Amino acid sequence: MAGKKTKSGMISHGMAAQNRKGRFDYTILETTEAGIVLKGPEVKSLRLGRATITEAYAAERDGEIWLFNSYIPEYQGGVLSRFEPRAPRKLLMHRKQIAHFLGAVSRAGASLVPLDIHFNARGMAKVTLGLGQGRRKEDKRHAIAERDWKRDKARLVRSSGKDY
């Protein structure tokens, strides 16, 4: 779901990109919100809602958390502002948060999974990171069956309330 759009078609606040596959492939144990360092045209491109984070991952580099392999396409409106669409982008977190998440990654063998990129109420770009434990194939099947059952149950409840 995209966030609220202005006249120009840009997202002012709300969801810019979502990693639905991340929630399916990983059991999310804990989430946090982190700021992201972006250049001007990257923000404009992100506001158009054209970013992809399906293949993205977060990892440690020099004691900081970075977002790798996220795709933010070049903004077509700018002429002089070129940037690398898949460049690593620094995530802004407190030192204690970084230590907590890196400790969990090294101890439990978990992964830092970017779940979405959104704009908060102040218009700042944020990344929701999840500490995820990888799911096995049978766990994925169980998740699919559970999701289907919830959908069918909701459908039955809706249809049982109708008068014939």
From Swiss-Prot:
One of the GO BP terms on file: trans-translation
Gene Ontology CC: cytosol
Gene Ontology molecular function, alphabetical: RNA binding
Pfam families: SmpB (PF01668)
PROSITE patterns named in the record: SSRP
Superkingdom in the source lineage: Bacteria
Compartmental location: Cytoplasm
Annotated S-S bridges: none
Keyword Chaperone: no
Keywords for this protein: Cytoplasm, RNA-binding
Claim: Cytoplasm is one of the keywords in the record: yes
Function (record text): Required for rescue of stalled ribosomes mediated by trans-translation. Binds to transfer-messenger RNA (tmRNA), required for stable association of tmRNA with ribosomes. tmRNA and SmpB together mimic tRNA shape, replacing the anticodon stem-loop with SmpB. tmRNA is encoded by the ssrA gene; the 2 termini fold to resemble tRNA(Ala) and it encodes a 'tag peptide', a short internal open reading frame. During trans-translation Ala-aminoacylated tmRNA acts like a tRNA, entering the A-site of stalled ribosomes, displacing the stalled mRNA.
Family membership: Belongs to the SmpB family.
Protein name in the entry: SsrA-binding protein
